[in-house]
Every structure is written in C-alpha cells, then in structure tokens.
C-alpha cells in the first residue's frame, strides 16, 4: 500500500536498498493503486512470462499507516500496530503469500534506515496474531547482521523468530549466509534453529543456492579504481572511451594502479590476492569460470603482473565492458560446499534470491 504523497519515498527506498535506478521506476510504474487489494488488481491486468507471487511488506505498510513517523522509525503506538495488523490480514485474504520485514541496518535510504528496521516484538506481535487468525502464512525477514548472525545478536534474532512463529502458528524464515569473517558460524546458527524447533515452533534458515556477489566495472557503482584522483576525469565517459584512454596512455594506467594501491578498498583485500581458494573472478563475454585457477590472484601469479594491473586489463576488455565478480558470501572456501550442507539441514529452505532486483549485486 502507498499513500499518493508517499510514492517518491518508496521509489527512493527501492533505489537505495534494491539498487534499481529511480528513473527506471518513475518512468515504468503506473501509480493506479493505493491499497494492497488495488495493487493486486493492478498487476493482475498485465501479461507476464512468469507467475507472480506477492508478499505484504512491513516497510510499506508501516509508512502507509504512520507516514513520516514510520519513515523516521519512531515507535508504533498500539493503534498503529492494530492498523498494520488489519492491513496485513486484509492482504492475506486478497492473495498475499506471506509477510516480510527487515531488521538489517544494511538496508538504508536517504539518511537513515528503511521503515521498520528498529521494530521489535511489541509492533510485530499484533501482526503475527492477525496472521494466525487468517489461518497462518509464511513470515520472512532479514535479521540483524544479515551477512551472518553475529554472536551478540543471533540468539535474540532467533528468539524473535521463534516468538513470531509461536504467535502466528506459521513458519518463520530468516536469511542464513556463510560470511568470510566467520566461515563456520552458520553451523552454530542451524544448531540454534534446531534447539528452538524442539519446542514446537517452525524456524528455518533461508539459503540462496549460489554465492552472493557484487559486479564491478566502469559503469557500476563500485570498481577498484574509483577512489583514485584520476577516476573523476574518466567517470563521465562511455565504457569504450574509458578503455581507449587507459590502453593508449601508459602513464594514466600506471597512475590508476598507484591510486588504487594507496586507497585500499574491498577489492584489494589480501585474501583475494593471496588465498587462491577465494577467487575474484573476471567476467567477459563467455560464461564465467569460478574455479580458483581463473581468479585474479591465479592470473597474477601466472603472468607475474600486479593484481591491480590484471583487474584493469579485465575492465578494459570487451570494449570497456569487462566485469569483476566479487563474492561476498557463501564462497569463503572457494566452493559451494557450505551451501550444500546448509540445504541438507532440515531447518533450512532454498530461497533468498533477489530475482533481478539488484542491478549489481546477484544472489
């Protein structure tokens, strides 16, 4: 649901959290709905190549009910919570498959977190009660520390999931990811899922079937050379023009490499260069090869070139359209063995795909 005055905020939220350019949304969305039932009527009029399933999302409902108070993450009043619960119940009757919310502070927009990030059990429980009254429906959320449940937070997030499952009489799924800071933590998280499930609640980890990656290139938000002094002189050019300038000017190429070396960022992690099992993979016109021997580190070792020089050559390839594939999660061991083990566990479910929402982050 969206109030007419709130349309721009939802666009900005989608741009910042889902990486969809605002211009694409503004030019492609027909704002011919306000309520969730009206939204369902709107999308049912289209012709699609795939069947569409819809969740009712907490952030939009909160902003619809509370306006700017909701956007600023002020606490919900009992009346606010009751109205949100009414809307969620109505949405389930109208065809929503489930309810979703986010507590991760990785999801930001404008100068703050998206609506609902700070919401706790007091706000969510009335919604869970409404879900139970409608016969139950899956609940999904991104927990605090979406990159992995950090020890200081994971038990509280899992207890929140258990309480919502208990109240809603429904399964609750939360993101479960292998992250490089602690590649084994997912095992203890699954143990906690098992422990709470023994009390009769249904809590599952939602696992993506692949690594979660960011793509870096000349026209993406991130690349290894963007923080150097010379990049602003190139960023307004087309990919082809950038590649031509770099390839025809050895001095510029060397300055870009030197600038990247002096402005360390995530692309220059020692792990990428020195650990051959954690590949930063070049992407070109052919299908990507995710084997460690195709990583930037491996190419650098074979050719005796600076890894940043190899990266720059990759980005200049294919007329400036070359890309680097940076695996954030589920690839800490250089393979998908952890994903395989997660998916074999009875307290996991396959999911967590962004389905094309992010333009530069793939899961």
Protein language model annotation of sequence segments:
Residues 1-98, 134:
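Divalent-metal coordination cores built from histidine and acidic residues
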Residues 9-28, 32, 69-79, 110-120, ...:
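Glycine-rich tight-turn/loop motif centered on a GG-T
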Residues 50-54, 97-98, 137-139, 171-173, ...:
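Structural motif
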Residues 52, 95, 206, 304, ...:
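Divalent metal-coordination and catalytic microenvironments
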Residues 73-74, 88-227:
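Functional cores that coordinate and move charged inorganic groups
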Residues 87-88, 127, 161-162, 192-193, ...:
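Generic recognition of flexible, low-complexity loop/linker segments
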Residues 196, 200, 204-330, 346:
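Hard-cation-handling environments
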Residues 311, 331-363:
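C-terminal substrate/ligand-recognition segments
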């Amino acid at each position: 649901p969206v109030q007419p005055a709130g349309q721009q905020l939802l666009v900005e939220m989608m741009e910042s959290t889902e990486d969809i350019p605002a211009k694409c949304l503004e030019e492609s969305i027909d704002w011919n709905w306000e309520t969730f039932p009206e939204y369902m009527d709107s999308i049912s009029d289209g012709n699609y190549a795939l069947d569409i399933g819809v969740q009712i999302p907490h952030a939009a409902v909160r902003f619809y009910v509370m306006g700017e108070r909701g956007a600023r993450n002020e606490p919900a009043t009992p009346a606010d919570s009751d109205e949100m619960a009414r809307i969620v119940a109505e949405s389930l009757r109208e065809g929503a498959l489930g309810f979703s919310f986010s507590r991760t502070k990785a999801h930001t927009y404008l100068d703050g977190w998206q609506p609902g990030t700070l919401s706790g059990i007091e706000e969510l429980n009335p919604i869970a009660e409404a879900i139970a009254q409608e016969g139950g429906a899956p609940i999904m959320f991104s927990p605090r520390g979406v990159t992995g449940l950090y020890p200081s937070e994971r038990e509280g997030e899992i207890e929140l999931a258990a309480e919502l499952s208990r109240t809603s009489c429904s399964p609750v799924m939360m993101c479960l990811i292998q992250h490089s800071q602690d590649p084994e933590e997912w095992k203890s998280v699954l143990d906690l899922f098992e422990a709470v499930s023994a009390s009769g609640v249904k809590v599952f980890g939602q696992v993506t079937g692949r690594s979660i990656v960011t793509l870096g290139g000349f026209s993406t938000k991130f690349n290894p050379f963007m923080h150097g002094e010379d990049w602003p002189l190139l960023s307004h050019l087309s990919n082809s023009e950038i590649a031509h300038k770099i390839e025809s000017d050895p001095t510029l190429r060397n300055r870009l490499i030197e600038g990247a070396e002096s402005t360390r960022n995530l692309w220059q992690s020692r792990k990428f260069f020195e650990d051959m099992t954690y590949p930063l993979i070049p992407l070109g016109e052919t299908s990507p090869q995710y084997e460690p021997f195709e990583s930037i580190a491996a190419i650098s070792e074979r050719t005796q070139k600076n890894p940043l020089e190899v990266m720059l050559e990759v980005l200049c390839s294919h007329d400036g359209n070359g890309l680097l594939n940076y695996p954030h999660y589920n690839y800490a061991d250089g393979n998908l063995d952890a994903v395989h083990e997660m998916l074999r566990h009875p307290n996991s479910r396959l999911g967590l795909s962004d389905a094309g929402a992010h333009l530069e982050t793939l899961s």
